Amino acid sequence: LPVRTAEVIQDILKSSMSESHRKGVSFNVLSNPEFLAEGTAINDLENPDRILIGGDNKDAMLALSKIYKTWVHEDKILFTNIWSSELAKLTANAFLAQRISSINSIAAICEVTGADVREVSRAIGKDTRIGSKFLDSSPGFGGSCFKKDILNLVYLAEYFGLQEVADFWESVVKINNWHQNRISKLVVKKLFGTVSEKKIVILGFSF
């Protein structure tokens, strides 16, 4: 969701309630983003890395945390303001997408130099500051989340006059688009210039 969604929803709810309805009614809108991955959603829900609850009402935030505490250790429950919670969701996806574009850009260099991107990935992945996740060269990222969330960051940066920041994140999408186009051309080249009437098998196709 775009940053400030919770704030907008709360304003809409407040403005739609008449004075008579407001009496004795109390509500709070919280931000509670999910960090589930396709294919591992159930396990991610049962064993989350963290639970993020953003809001400005401590009682409401604690009430929601009690639900999670029935199966999640309280050390994994994080409390932030709404802005931080909503931005953390966008940033998490942006960082994952950035890793994909980064290793794919290195893959292009490996191809022209004779290096093996798998060996490079394994070597840098041993660095504990970097880690090994999301370092497999691939056709790039797709789906409905990564690109959307990055462009949301781009819009946000441009809105606040941070053009260099916007350009940085937009480059992640540009690299991804360039890499996907490069891969498609490589496939056609390997199939002698055409895919017409050719049988192509895609292994591990997923979201």
Language-model region placement:
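Structural/interface elements that position substrates and couple domains in central-metabolism enzymes
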Residues: 1-207
